[in-house]
A protein has these predicted regions:
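Alpha-helix capping/hinge segments and adjacent helical runs
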Residues: 15-99, 172-176
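Charged, amphipathic alpha-helical oligomerization/scaffolding segments
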Residues: 27, 31-38, 113-116, 120-123, ...
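Long, amphipathic alpha-helical stalk/connector segments used for oligomerization, subunit docking
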Residues: 86, 92-135
């Protein structure tokens, strides 16, 4: 098949989505690995000590989830890749776009909770970046990245729930389980 040149609008759209992919990839890899590890760990706990030693499916799942972090890069490497999107305001800008998207009336409470969390996240980012202290930023980097990730994922779940009731319960459980920042 013959490729055609992109129109200026298509190039601009491609550039926008390439930037989003660059920003969201470390969030997806880091948070996905952490969620997998936590779920596998919880699975093993129901079996007590034998969950580590016997041939339960959770033993394999635990090994697989641990190795995922190695294949994808450790969570700390993902934080290093993501922190620049925190400090440049890229995540906050995207969060603000999500805040302005309409949601189903029954999900407005979740959206408001996420808006409140985003406001506190923005205050934390401002306080830490204005300190101009690299050690402080390094110390807080993982927390800031996780805050952004939870808010973004919450908004994405609320958007999905607005489009289909199939996702409403998941959005409720996820957003309401977040510690209110």
């Amino acid at each position: 098949s013959k490729e055609r040149k992109l129109t200026p609008e298509e190039r601009a759209e491609q550039k926008t989505f390439a930037k989003l992919a660059d920003a969201f990839t470390p969030l997806g890899k880091g948070m996905g690995s952490e969620f997998a590890n936590q779920n596998a760990y919880d699975c093993i706990q129901i079996h007590g000590g034998s969950g580590f030693m016997k041939d339960y499916a959770c033993e394999r799942i635990y090994r697989d989830s641990r190795i995922t972090s190695i294949y994808e890069g450790t969570t700390q490497l993902q934080v290093v890749a993501a922190i620049r999107y925190v400090t440049t305001g890229a995540y906050l800008a995207r969060i603000q776009e999500y805040e302005n998207m309409p949601v189903a009336p029954e999900l407005e409470g979740l959206q408001n909770r996420l808006k409140s969390m985003a406001s506190k996240y923005a205050a934390c980012v401002t306080q830490i970046t204005e300190a101009k202290d690299q050690e402080l930023l390094d110390f807080c980097a993982r927390r800031l990245v996780e805050m952004a990730a939870h808010i973004i994922m919450g908004h994405l779940m609320v958007q999905d729930a607005s489009k289909s009731d199939l996702f409403s319960e998941s959005a409720q459980v996820y957003v309401l389980s977040l510690i209110h920042i």
